[in-house]
């Protein structure tokens, strides 16, 4: 499967537009940032609680990425740092499918300066089993032998910062993956997992990044036969 993405845009650029108007709320949307430059207007285009199509925008947006989708618009990916111990999140707890933290896929039109659609990015998540050394469709039983039994569950907790890496980042001389990936990880202590998602919502747990309280997973853009990822630890973990 070949994925072609023409251009990468910084997520911040999606939210900042050149203009002469003072920053102000659009409709009922609050403004969280004020421009220090009179030539720049910052306009909120979506906020928690907005209903776009059939999707209600979730809270705690965190790591983001954006790219030219080749259809005259910009696609924005946004983490929601929802913890599985949150009372509202627990209402959607499942023993057969992922729940908790999610990634929203927004499509933005530069012409109308509006979000035209929004959906949950998740389509299929492949979990790593540290005991068999293979991927499986369930997280159950995949934890390392020295971890508590069933410490890996369907709940995904606190996706924090994230990195969008464009197509071409992970392939060299025809070897590797030729599509774009969105990398992120849980931020809940030394049992946290790292993940990568393609633009179709297929996700893979990344066993070789280890288990730690991830702030971000940042693959380097330098071409070569190996991929180097930089990771920093946050949250309450101090001994990984």
Question: Can you describe what each PLM-predicted range is?
Answer:
Residues 1-24:
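Gram-negative bacterial Sec-dependent N-terminal signal peptides
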């Amino acid at each position: 499967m070949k994925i072609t993405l023409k251009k990468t845009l910084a997520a911040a650029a999606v939210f900042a537009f050149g203009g002469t108007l003072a920053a102000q709320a659009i409709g009922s949307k609050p403004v969280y940032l004020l421009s220090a430059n009179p030539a720049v207007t910052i306009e909120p285009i979506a906020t928690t609680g907005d209903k776009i199509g059939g999707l209600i925008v979730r809270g705690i947006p965190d790591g983001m990425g954006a790219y030219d989708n080749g259809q005259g618009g910009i696609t924005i990916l946004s983490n929601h740092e929802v913890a599985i111990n949150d009372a509202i999140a627990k209402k959607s707890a499942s023993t057969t499918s992922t729940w908790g933290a999610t990634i929203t896929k927004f499509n933005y039109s530069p012409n109308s300066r509006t979000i035209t659609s929004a959906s949950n990015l998740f389509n299929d998540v492949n979990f790593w089993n540290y005991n068999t050394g293979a991927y499986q469709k369930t997280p159950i039983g995949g934890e390392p032998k020295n971890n508590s039994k069933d410490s890996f569950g369907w709940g995904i907790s606190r996706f924090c910062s994230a990195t969008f890496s464009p197509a071409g980042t992970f392939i060299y001389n025809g070897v590797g993956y030729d599509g774009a990936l969105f990398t992120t990880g849980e931020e809940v202590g030394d049992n946290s997992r790292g993940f990568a998602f393609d633009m179709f919502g297929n996700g893979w747990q990344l066993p070789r990044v280890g288990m730690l309280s991830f702030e971000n997973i940042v693959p380097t853009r330098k071409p070569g036969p190996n991929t180097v990822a930089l990771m920093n630890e946050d949250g309450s973990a101090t001994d990984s």
